Each structure stands twice: as structure tokens, then as C-alpha cells.
């Protein structure tokens, strides 16, 4: 009598990791149905318990079916769970930053074993804290790709996501006020500068010349341009050109005396103190003439009458001209009993008296209406 034949059909589990536990054999069919089934994993000991699989793995299962009066049969199958595709999602995939302000986004899944790189660290860098990625702008404007990568694990493949960071340079707020005033003999800064950020580098150029970090100053009357340039890494350089003006001051002029009387043929003098060189002239040279030596003004009588001596302090680099007046009266000498004997004289013979000739005990002299 021959043993019966057992029919054994088995379907192994082959799938992708899904976090669920599965029978190692997804289907098993045996005839007769009451045959005894035993399982061996990778050639190990047999057990009546169905093997399970959950995590990514690969192994063999041998199934043995037996029953009294039947020939024992077996089959070996390969069980396999493949890695699932890694999961990586970002709350944002692009953003614009203006130096020095940063921005951030979150990783919504799988924050373990994450690495972050930047395509250009001069433009932007990134760091991870928990599930938050902070993007910091560099000092160079442009675009940088922030790449987030999860490492391969037992059950998941590596996954990559990218964030495009656009970085703009920051803005410098530059406010410049030029000096405008009247000459006062003191030195002044050519401009007043206010800048944000306060540590920006400030440079100055006078009339388009070479830049210098030294603040230009102004004392004397002048007019010139100052270009102020503010710069800092990560910021757009800003500049502005302003005109500096120092105007002439009003001239000053004072006289030691402002009027006088001269008895012909005498002279008189006074001093003039001014902000420029001194000159003078007479309104009537038939009465008086004037000369200047340094700051001394000498008035010489010519004939009886009145004249105005105009004194001028000249315009110069820092002062406007200034004038002042000196009033002079010229008189002849008064005849007295000590003047001697006087005779009328017609010097040029035209019938008009030109003067009087005086004679005393000591000398003889002639006064000819302005001549002696």
C-alpha cells in the first residue's frame, strides 16, 4: 500500500515597509487540510507558529506538510520587505531674505538623521533646531539652494528636499547735512553725518577727488562739494553729494577819530583799524588831500572849506569791504595885532587879490589864498 500525496501551495509575502506586521506567507493551501504544517526560518528549527515580518528584511521560510499515511512534502520560499521611500516635506520651499534678517521653515516629517547643506555659504547658510530650519543671509546677494537630506534607515530610503533662498543686500540709511554759514574764524566740519547701521564705514571725497576716512573741515570763505559714501559688508553702498558754503563776513572798520579841524597849512592824522587793507580819498582835494601809511591816515590842508575823507577796508578772502567817513574842516589863520603889517597882493596881475603880505619885526611872508 502506497502513502498518499499531500498538495502544498504557498505564496510568500513580498512588499514595502508600511509599519504593519504581516504573515511571512500571505497565502497557504494544503490538502488534506488537516495536514500538520511546520515552519523553519533560514534552515532553523521547525515550529508550528506562522513566522511574521514587519521591518525591512529578507529571509527564507521552509514549510513542511505531514500527515500519517501521506508522504511528507516541503517547499522553501523567500520573504522580503523592501524599504519604503523616505518621507520629507517642508513648510516652505523658497523665500527672500534681506541682510541681516533671517527666515525659517519647518520639516514636517522625519526629522531624525537630517543633514543640511548650502550651495553657496557666502549667500546663505542654514541650521536645524528640532524640526525648525533657520536660514541666515550671507554678505553676498544672490540665490543659494539649501538642501535637506534624510539618511537611509532600516525601513526608509534617503530623501532630499530643497529650499531656494534669495538674498538681497540690506539698505544703509545715510543722512548728510552740509555746513553753510558765514566766516567766523573757526574751523567747522564740512558735513554732519547720520547713518544706520551706525558701524558703516564712512568715506569722504572733496570735489570728486580721492576718498578718505578723514572728515573734511572748512574755515575760510569757500564753496566745494563733499561726496559722502557709506559701506558695510552685506549692505548696498550709499552715497550723496552736498555743497559746502562759507560766505564772506561783513567787513569791520573803525577810526580813532571821525572829524577834525585843521588850520592851514597844517596836517592831521588818525588811525584806521579794519579787516582788510586800508585806502582813503578826499571828496574835495581843493580843501584837503589824504595819504595812507599802514593804518595811519594823514589829512593835509590845501584850502579853506570842508571835505569828507572816505576810508575803505578792502574786501579780501573772508570779509566784504567796509567804508567809514572822516569830516575835515580847513580854516585860515586869524589876523591879530601880532601878525604885523598886511598888504594886499595881486600875484598874477589879473586885478584880483590873491593874498596878503605880512611884515613884522622878525620875518616877511605871504599868504596867497592857499599858498605860502
Indicate where each model-derived feature is located.
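Acidic, glycine-anchored loop motifs typical of Ca2+
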Residues: 19, 346-357, 365, 372
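An edge-strand/N-cap motif at the start of beta-rich repeat modules
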Residues: 332-345
